[in-house]
Amino acid sequence: MSRNPIERCIRDSLDTYYRDLDGENPSNVYDMVLQAIERPLLETVMEWASNNQSLAADYLGINRNTLRKKLQQHGLL
């Protein structure tokens, strides 16, 4: 069972995804999920960090340069 609201939301979304496949085999689910969550995650954390990249990187537990690269990849800089 889900331990928190985020996990529950992901589980519910994946259940819907699998039901909507209508018998087709899924592919690249891991990449699909990561791509779907990364941009809103970055946007939300940057908002909570008042666009301070060092603080946002700390919140995410990643290096500031890694955060900057991800922000650029998503066109958020």
From Swiss-Prot:
GO terms for biological process: regulation of DNA-templated transcription. Keywords: DNA-binding. Residues 53-72 bind DNA. Coiled coil: none annotated. Gene3D superfamilies: Homeodomain-like (1.10.10.60). SUPFAM superfamilies: Homeodomain-like. It holds the Pfam family HTH_8. GO terms for molecular function: sequence-specific DNA binding. The keyword Disulfide bond does not apply. Belongs to the transcriptional regulatory Fis family. This is Putative Fis-like DNA-binding protein. It comes from Ralstonia nicotianae (strain ATCC BAA-1114 / GMI1000) (Ralstonia solanacearum).
